[in-house]
Each structure stands twice: as C-alpha cells, then as structure tokens.
Amino acid sequence: MKSGYYISAFVCCNELQNILDIKLRHDQTIALWYFDGDKNVKLVRYWELERISGYKQHPKAFFDTKAFFELLQTLLHQENLSLDDINDIWGTKEIEKSTEYRDFFANTNIAFHSIAHMMSCMYYGNSQPFGTDMILLSLDAGPDSQFEEDAYNKNFYAGGVIKNGELDIFSIESPARLWSYSFKKFKLREGTLMALATAVDTQIDFDISKFDNISFFDDSTRIKARKIVDEIADFVFSSELPENADKRFSEEEHKISAVMKNIVNLSQRIVERNVDNIIKRYNLVPNKTILAMAGGFALNCPTNSYLLQKYRFKDYQIPP
C-alpha cells in the first residue's frame, strides 16, 4: 500500500434495488482513512448514511454508481479533498478498485464479512492489540454476499486468538440465527425479545440439552435455527400458563417470554462451549486475557452478562 487516502464503503449501488426498495445492506456507511506509508492508519471521517438521508438504518441502495460518486465527492469536499486524492475504494463490488485487502484472509475459508467484524473488535479502543492475550469472537447472523459472491459456501463466523504476539484465525459457532428467526416468527425485534424474556417470571422449561450435538458454523444454521425455535415454541405454546401469571401481559407475551428464556439459555450454552474450547486449546488464563466480540449477536445483553460473570476476563472490547 502506498501512503495517502482510502475509502471503505459499505453501500449498495443497483437500479433495481433502488426502484423496488430491495434491502440487502442495512446501516450503510462510508469511511475515509489515511495511511502514512509506514504502520499508521488514521480514521479521518466516518459517515453514517442514515444521518444524511434520514432513513433509519439506511438500507436504501444508490440508483447507480454515478449517484454514489456524486455524494462521495460532496463528502470529500468537506475535507478539502476530491476523488483524485483517493488511492483505492473497498467494500462494494460495483465501486471498489481492488480486492487485495481480502487476500491475507483468503485461506481461512471464512466469509470476509465476519472477518471484518472480528478485526473491528480487535482494534476497538486498542491500538496495540498484539501486546496481550485476546479471544476474538465474531457473532453474527450471516455473511454479506454483495461483494463476496461465494460467501454462503464458506464458514460464516470468525474466531481468533492473539497469543505471544501472533494472531490465529479459525471458524466458530454463533447462535445469532436463533434470534433472527425468532424476530421473523414473533414479529418482535431482537432487543424487544431480550427485554420480554426478563419482563415476566413465566418459565416453561424445555430440555435444550437435546440440541448439544447440533453445530452452528455455516449456512445450514439457517434451517437448524428455524427447526429449533419452532420446536421450543410448539412445546411452550401447548403448555398451560401458571395461575399467578402477571395479568399486565397477554398470554401470547407470557409464552413468547418463556420461549425466549429457553433461547437465551441455549445461546449461552453455544457461546460457552466455544469459549471453553478456545481457552483449553490455547491454554489461556481468563483473568489475563481480553475478550473481544463484534457482530449483531455481540449486542446480546443476557449472553454478554453471563460471559462476564462466569469468566472474569481481564478486559472487554465490545463495539456498541
């Protein structure tokens, strides 16, 4: 890489997506970076497109690349820069100039979207991550095929360990699909489901240990998650509520809460076994090790609290 400015753009540029309002990427962003030619990279500006467009989570595609570059030129002008000052653009197939940034990770057989999540938590609030032991977990629902066409043929979730100044990358499991399918099934966002799980005391226990032999590494997770959530929900919804159930909540809300309590426990079980395996494999000491997590599921409060209380890691790097 030569010194100068670079753009990473997590956007969509497609006429059909724009006209039909097809949403393939949410929370679209553009980042401006500066590389000094040595070892230092600086984030100059970070533009969340929802703050420009007013669209919450901005999933709207640009009509075409011309529309994108018109906006980019306007944004760069604010920094006294132009398109001619940009060495390279990454992150969106229709506009990126090269894919060299992915070459380092090509042999991992892990979707790059997950690798990107992992690297973001690795450097979150820590410009020198190689100075201490660290566990990295990219806990997301799925990859991004918008710029990596074979993403769905790879392992979905990236894990990593930094030890003795070296980074080792490997595939891990993520329970995020359990939550994304629950969102679709119950028509409630993941945060609402988390809150509802603890809002009432209603508990209808399901033997989640029966799922211990099911793995959650790749595209097969989509079908597995649906079957698991449906099975738990069928059991719970066919059960009677306790007589002292809180009358402020409907029967449906009580039963969704009971379903999600089981999903919370299963999610913790999945992440826990991955963390235990990593600690054992790399002979790590939790109170001397940083836990770094990113991806949509890394915002799962019940699981995060469980991990923090159980392992007492040295520190935590979890981007909001």
Predicted regions and their residues:
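Short acidic/glycine-rich loops and adjacent helix/strand connectors
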Residues: 1-320
